């Protein structure tokens, strides 16, 4: 039987932090009823029982293993405190005093020593357990949890604890225990060296749990106010109210994905604890957006299950624990909608790993393992598994990231398409310019380097630098802000346009695009990156990267850098001749105070300048997968290949190998002559893309004509990518006129039949021969139709015509023998300027309109035609 002892100066009833006496019935019922709960219980017993039994025979066996305090054996402390914590939990569940005794004896020897301990200072950082930063996350939380679960046991005058100093038993010293929890709480909050970031959250439970174990109500409230409000504003520790307010407008923590998700999960744990102890704050109901935002993370994963990676982040990021926290909170607070959604999503996540089979371990950092039992809720077999919502276009606002995916395939893992571009300043940001990652054939192929163990040399001089990502460096300048303050690492990349817009539905199963701009004042340049993601079949597609870049000063040269996991990278001209590459000293040095990171490139070989088209092939020989890169002719460039350091967490074991790199150097500006690369992932060495030609609008390069052959079908895409939505591209030879930022004309020819697709991603109008597509109110549109014949010609047989096609003010309606037709006159932006009814030879006066290009649309009962004409007064 559990006895409750409450001091006269406090109102808390123990246990209270992770679980209460009232919670016990449901927890033990779960242990009896459900395999997942009974499994956790059995695992806890198997881990603790041998130690419990040994301790009963000889207490000094375990107690004598406590490392020195203060000292550096953090692992030894963690193992012992974890044993005590698990034993304390088992005492709570079973009322077996042997578990309580083991936990209490370990606790007492720690609290007696810590109450007297003076922290050790090394390199300006104070610590008790060997690491000022990690101990606040590992050891500090375990001590109050042990204390809470055995509080009534140790304060029962009938019980004693074993004291190694006297080699005998004594009464538990609650005074030293109280001194310890206060000391740890204050030490935790004072040790934070990076305010206004996730550090106070990661260390926060070390402070919160110790504060909530302070007996005296007045003192506890004073400490809690410092944690929650910090009214003095003197602590480096971020008040929890600041933390809650710091979530982004998308309701996610504004750092890299792995730090964001982890931080948000810890915040949920703290919210649940605070709400248990201080319900009057109404912290859950007032901050439901923190729960809502957790589902956004599912949008940040490639089809293989690897997370996108920007800044100091990782690929393998589990989402189960964060959904378990939502379910725990929602169940305790009786929030039906949140309960239902969390259960459905968890059911889906469990299905991916063969069911929910929890494994008890000693958590190496953040400690939450026991909560799977204490806060766990069963998910019935009748619950329907539901994948978290994912979208075709996703914007990560704080990181300046836009990602797009095309899963219009029967096998999204192998044939799904997905990429991201962007960059910004946030905690743990890298200076990247407008970086990019590309997915294909089950792997993240186009990669940034990632982050390892923060080795000072390679992390500072490469991993966080431009050359570790896929970007463009201007005039060798790769400056960045001060990492130590995370205030202005780089300027934020802004989204100019995308189709679909973030979180909206795509209008096409084949075409998506985004365009982003960076005003890089650190490196005195303006850059714009437009990526079109083009699907050509269920199993094929490509990315068209159009990267514009110009210096605000002298345009000496621009370097386009692209990393792709693999074994080799080779280059050939478009005619299949090998590109001559010779050893080069390029990239061996950096400009002083402008570290790009490219000095980490090795085995650099470069070409002479050439205007010929060049194709690169990245080969993943062990898995027979490839990335084909097509760079059209027309602009003089120098091409290089190199070897970069291994890419962290690269799939298919390529994290063990150096990373192949391709670079392109272009002298002069790269704005009117942007870099254009078509990337096609393929299984096998026969890509579907056969040729890529740049599209010209006067002297400007504005996209590419891409010809693919897929299953015997010849697909021709005119992918038009202009710098702004008000610009007009005219191609007389191909009978194309487009006003807009991004558009595609596609013809697919097979067996004498031509399919045509007209796509406006962002713009106002697109004409191909007689067909005109006018954008909708969202400035996009899609039109598809079939034409008999292998080629498309201007419709010269129709009796519906206007003339002349160049007029000084008047046009004539040619309607043949029709008695009456309907007509409408449109501007290039799709605005209807004039409409009505006409008969053959009706003259329409347009002299009131300004010079320019217009469309006339004519309709009778049997047909509809659109015809372009020019008004030139």
Please report, for each region that a protein language model flagged, where it lies by residue.
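Non-catalytic terminal regions with compositionally biased, polar/charged low complexity
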Residues: 664-790
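C-terminal outer-membrane/trafficking sorting elements
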Residues: 5, 788-873
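Polysaccharide-binding surfaces and accessory modules of carbohydrate-active proteins
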Residues: 561-631
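Catalytic and substrate-binding regions of extracellular carbohydrate-active enzymes
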Residues: 351-579, 669-671, 677, 681-684, ...
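Aromatic-lined, polymer-binding surfaces characteristic
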Residues: 31, 38-41, 45, 71-295, ...
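C-terminal, helix-dominated tail/subdomain
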Residues: 282-364
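Bacterial Sec-dependent N-terminal signal peptides
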Residues: 1-11
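Low-complexity, Ser/Thr/Pro/Gly-enriched N-terminal "stalk/linker" regions
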Residues: 10-68
């Amino acid at each position: 039987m559990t006895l409750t002892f409450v001091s006269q100066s406090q109102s808390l009833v123990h246990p209270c932090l992770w679980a209460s006496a009232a919670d016990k019935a449901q927890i033990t019922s779960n242990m009896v009823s459900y395999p997942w709960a009974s499994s956790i219980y059995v695992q806890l017993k198997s881990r603790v029982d041998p130690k419990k039994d040994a301790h009963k025979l000889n207490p000094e066996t375990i107690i004598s293993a406590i490392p020195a305090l203060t000292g550096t054996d953090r692992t030894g402390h963690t193992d012992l405190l974890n044993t005590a914590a698990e034993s304390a939990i088992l005492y709570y569940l079973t009322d077996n005093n042997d578990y309580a005794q083991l936990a209490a004896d370990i606790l007492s020897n720690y609290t007696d020593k810590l109450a007297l301990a003076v922290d050790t200072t090394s390199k300006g950082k104070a610590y008790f357990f060997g690491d000022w930063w990690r101990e606040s996350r590992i050891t500090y939380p375990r001590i109050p949890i042990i204390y809470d679960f055995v509080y009534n046991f140790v304060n029962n005058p009938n019980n004693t604890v074993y004291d190694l100093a006297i080699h005998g038993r004594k009464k538990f010293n609650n005074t030293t225990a109280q001194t310890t929890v206060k000391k740890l709480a204050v030490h935790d909050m004072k040790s934070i060296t990076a305010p206004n970031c996730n550090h106070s959250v990661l260390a926060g439970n070390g402070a919160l749990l110790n504060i909530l174990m302070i007996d005296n109500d007045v003192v506890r409230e004073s400490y809690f106010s410092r944690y929650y409000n910090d009214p003095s504003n003197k602590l480096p520790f971020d008040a929890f109210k600041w933390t809650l307010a710091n979530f982004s407008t998308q309701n996610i923590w504004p750092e890299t994905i792995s730090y964001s998700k982890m931080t948000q999960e810890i915040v949920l744990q703290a919210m649940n604890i605070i709400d248990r102890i201080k319900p009057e704050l109404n912290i859950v109901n007032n901050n439901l957006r923190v729960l809502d935002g957790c589902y956004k993370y599912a949008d940040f994963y490639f089809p293989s299950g690897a997370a996108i990676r920007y800044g100091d982040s990782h690929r393998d990021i589990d989402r189960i624990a964060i959904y378990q926290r939502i379910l725990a909170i929602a169940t305790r607070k009786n929030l039906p909608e949140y309960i239902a959604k969390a259960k459905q999503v968890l059911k889906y996540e469990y299905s991916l790993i063969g069911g929910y089979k929890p494994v008890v371990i000693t958590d190496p950092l953040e400690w939450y393992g026991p909560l799977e039992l204490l806060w766990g809720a069963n998910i019935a077999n009748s619950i329907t598994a539901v994948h978290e919502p994912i979208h075709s276009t996703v914007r990560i606002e704080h990181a300046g990231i836009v990602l797009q995916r095309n899963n219009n395939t029967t096998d999204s893992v192998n044939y799904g398409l997905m990429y991201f571009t962007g960059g910004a300043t946030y905690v743990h940001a890298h200076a990247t310019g407008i970086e990019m990652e590309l997915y294909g054939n089950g792997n993240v192929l186009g990669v940034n380097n990632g982050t390892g163990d923060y080795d000072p040399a390679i992390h500072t001089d490469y991993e966080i630098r431009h050359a570790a990502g896929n970007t463009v460096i201007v005039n060798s300048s790769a400056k960045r802000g001060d990492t130590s303050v995370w205030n202005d690492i780089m300027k934020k990349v802004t989204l100019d346009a995308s189709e679909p817009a973030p979180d909206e539905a795509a209008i096409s199963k084949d075409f998506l695009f985004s365009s982003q701009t960076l005003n890089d004042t650190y490196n005195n340049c303006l850059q714009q990156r437009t990526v079109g993601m083009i699907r050509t079949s269920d199993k094929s597609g490509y990315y068209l990267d159009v990267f514009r870049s110009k210096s605000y000063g002298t345009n000496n040269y621009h370097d386009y850098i692209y990393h792709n996991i693999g074994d080799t990278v080779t280059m050939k001209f478009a005619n299949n001749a090998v590109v001559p590459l010779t050893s080069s000293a390029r990239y061996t040095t950096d400009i002083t105070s402008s570290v790009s990171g490219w000095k980490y490139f090795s085995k650099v070989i470069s070409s002479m300048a050439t205007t010929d088209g060049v194709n690169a092939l990245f080969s993943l020989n062990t898995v027979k997968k490839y990335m084909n890169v097509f760079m059209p002719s027309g602009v003089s460039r120098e091409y290089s290949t190199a070897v970069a350091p291994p890419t962290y967490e690269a799939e298919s074991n390529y994290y063990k190998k150096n990373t192949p790199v391709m670079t392109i150097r272009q002298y002069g500006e790269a704005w009117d002559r942007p870099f254009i690369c078509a990337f096609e992932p393929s299984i096998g060495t026969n890509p579907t893309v056969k040729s890529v030609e740049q599209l010209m609008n006067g002297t400007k390069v504005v996209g590419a004509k891409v010809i693919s052959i897929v299953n015997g079908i010849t697909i021709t895409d005119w992918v038009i990518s202009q710098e702004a939505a008000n610009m007009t591209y005219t191609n007389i030879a191909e009978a194309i006129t487009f006003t807009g930022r991004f558009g595609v004309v596609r013809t697919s020819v097979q067996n004498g039949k031509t399919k045509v697709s007209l796509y406006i991603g962002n713009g106002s109008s697109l004409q191909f021969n007689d067909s005109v597509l006018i954008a909708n109110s969202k400035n996009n549109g899609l039109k598809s139709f079939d034409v008999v014949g292998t080629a498309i010609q201007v419709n010269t047989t129709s009796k519906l015509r206007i003339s002349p096609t160049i007029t000084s003010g008047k046009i004539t309606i040619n309607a043949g023998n029709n008695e009456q037709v309907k007509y409408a006159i449109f501007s290039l932006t799709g605005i209807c300027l004039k409409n009505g009814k006409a008969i053959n030879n009706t003259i329409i006066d347009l002299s009131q309109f300004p010079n320019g290009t217009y469309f006339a649309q004519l309709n009778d009962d049997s047909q509809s035609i659109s015809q372009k004409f020019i008004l030139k007064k």
